Swiss-Prot record:
One of its GO terms (biological process) is amino acid biosynthetic process. The gene is aroD. It catalyses: 3-dehydroquinate = 3-dehydroshikimate + H2O. InterPro entries: 3-dehydroquinate_DH_AS, Aldolase_TIM, DHquinase_I, Type-I_3-dehydroquinase. The active site is at 143 (proton donor/acceptor), 170 (schiff-base intermediate with substrate). Belongs to the type-I 3-dehydroquinase family. Keywords: Amino-acid biosynthesis, Aromatic amino acid biosynthesis, Lyase, Schiff base. Homodimer. It comes from Escherichia coli (strain 55989 / EAEC). Its EC number is 4.2.1.10. GO terms for molecular function: 3-dehydroquinate dehydratase activity. This is 3-dehydroquinate dehydratase.
Amino acid sequence: MKTVTVKDLVIGTGAPKIIVSLMAKDIARVKSEALAYREADFDILEWRVDHFADLSNVESVMAAAKILRETMPEKPLLFTFRSAKEGGEQAISTEAYIALNRAAIDSGLVDMIDLELFTGDDQVKETVAYAHAHDVKVVMSNHDFHKTPEAEEIIARLRKMQSFDADIPKIALMPQSTNDVLTLLAATLEMQEQYADRPIITMSMAKTGVISRLAGEVFGSAATFGAVKKASAPGQISVNDLRTVLTILHQA
């Protein structure tokens, strides 16, 4: 299986990489949060742009991205607008969503974008090609904050992302039971062993699913999300605790 290298970070080998999400409403908060995050132990900075209030002003959005890039130049920057239908803070049209991601790609400030699988097949394929033409990696994602589908469906979604040439397919699901967590882990393992030719990221959310955020190296998930301050999804634990557990499992 091939790995994905962003800056000096190799994703898909060794212990799962830690992603943290920065969620700030304006430029001032982006700046202060960035300074606080700079001291934390993580691998990839995700900027959750759906929390940013001044979305209609692309210049303002890119000014914020520039602050993040300049504050943490060594960290890979993942640009993510999480749609309202997949748990995000704001609802925008598909056209606006694609335009925002293209603006991020054009800016030269971001290393990766998050592109939701169910945005529309043609738009997704075109945006992946556009990102790759500008040397930007694509994390293709799907989130369900209500349920966990059958393993076959989880695998089908991850394989579809791979067929659309996502650099890293990602899925996050809400368990209704511990069995749902096992379903997610079994699907991850089957995908990783039988179909994946690139790194994947999977997680089961909430307290019930915490084990999935810790055991990625065992089952085949290449990265996990931790919290510096406020968690961006239910079930995230602090980056310091997360790094400790990931290191213990890696060295065992």
